[in-house]
Regions:
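Conserved beta-strand
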Residues: 6-9, 16-26, 33, 57
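Conserved ABC transporter NBD signature motif
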Residues: 57-68, 72-73
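Walker A (P-loop) phosphate-binding loop of ABC-type ATPase nucleotide-binding domains
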Residues: 36-40
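Catalytic Walker B motif of ABC-type/P-loop ATPase nucleotide-binding domains
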Residues: 150-154
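Helical segment within the ABC ATPase nucleotide-binding domain
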Residues: 164-177
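ABC-family P-loop ATPase nucleotide-binding domains
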Residues: 81-138
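ABC ATPase "signature
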Residues: 209-210
Length: 239
C-alpha cells in the first residue's frame, strides 16, 4: 500500500522546472531519493510539505489530497533537514516545550528515549550545536510525535561514520515497526545499506523509480556500487 503519492507535480522557476514528477512511498519501506545538487530533490520535498506552491499536479497522503487536508496530514508525518533555522538562541528544552503543543500525539517517553539515544543536552541552544547534532535534533522532533511517514532531507549530513551507521540501524528499526521513510541524500552508500526503493531525479525529471535491486541491475555494470552507477549516469547525461 502507498502512503504517499505524487502525480505529475510541477514547479516552475525562471531558471529551473520541476517537470511532472511522479512516484510513491510504499508503507513500511525506505525510499532513497538521489540526484545531484540542483536536480530538484529539495524542491520536490518542499512541494510534498506545501512549503512552496506547485504549478500543477497532485500530492496525496493516506489517500487524502494534501490540499485541503494539510493540518491533519502533518500530524502524521515528520520532516528533518540538516539545518536548524528557528529559535537559534532558545534552548532545546524551550523549543520542545513549544513544539509539542502542536502535536496531540506527542510521545514524551519516545522523546526522552531519543534524547538519550542522540546524546543531546536540553540546556544547549541550536547555535551551540555541531552540524551533526543539528541533524539529530531535527530527527528527535520528527520521531517524538509518532510520525507514520518521515521525510528526511540529507539526514546523515555532517555525521561521522559511526553516527551514520547508528542512524541507519535506527531507520531499520523504524521500518520494522511500519514507519515509511523518504531518504534524500547524496551519500548513496548509505542507501545501498538500507533502501528498498530508489527514486532518481535529474534536471527536474524523474529518470527512474524502481526497487533498489532492480535499479542497480538495470542500470549497473558488473561489480558497480550504487554510487558508481549514479556517477556514471550523471556523466552520461552531460555527455
Amino acid at each position: 500500500m502507498n502512503v504517499a503519492e505524487l502525480q505529475d507535480v510541477c514547479k516552475e522557476y525562471p531558471s529551473f522546472r520541476l517537470n511532472r514528477v511522479s512516484f510513491a512511498l510504499e508503507e513500511g519501506k525506505i525510499t532513497g531519493f538521489i540526484g545531484r545538487n540542483g536536480a530538484g530533490k529539495t524542491t520536490t520535498i518542499k512541494s510534498m510539505l506545501n512549503l512552496i506552491h506547485t504549478s500543477g499536479g497532485e500530492i496525496r497522503y493516506f489517500g487524502m489530497p494534501l490540499a485541503g487536508h494539510e493540518k491533519e496530514i502533518k500530524q502524521r508525518i515528520g520532516y528533518s533537514t540538516g539545518t536548524v533555522s528557528w529559535y537559534p538562541r532558545k534552548t532545546i528544552r524551550e523549543i520542545v516545550a513549544v513544539t509539542k503543543t502542536f502535536y496531540p500525539n506527542w510521545d514524551e517517553e519516545a522523546y526522552r528515549r531519543y534524547l538519550a539515544f542522540f546524546g543531546l543536552d536540553e540546556s544547549k541552544k541550536p547555535i551551540e550545536l555541531s552540524e551533526g547534532m543539528k541533524v539529530k535534533f531535527n530527527l528527535l522532533l520528527a520521531l517524538s510525535h509518532r510520525a507514520e511517514v518521515l521525510i528526511l532531507d540529507e539526514p546523515t549530513s555532517g555525521l561521522d561514520p559511526f553516527s551514520r551507521d547508528e542512524l541507519l540501524d535506527l531507520f531499520g528499526e523504524l521500518k520494522a515497526h511500519g514507519v515509511t521513510i523518504l531518504f534524500s541524500t547524496h551519500i548513496t552508500s548509505d542507501l545501498e545499506k538500507c533502501a528498498d526503493n530508489i527514486v532518481y531525479i535529474s534536471k527536474g525529471e524523474i529518470r527512474a523509480f524502481r526497487p533498489r535491486e532492480d535499479f542497480m541491475r538495470e542500470n549497473g555494470r558488473p561489480g558497480e556500487t550504487l554510487e558508481e552507477i549514479f556517477l556514471r549516469l550523471e556523466k552520461e547525461a552531460r555527455a
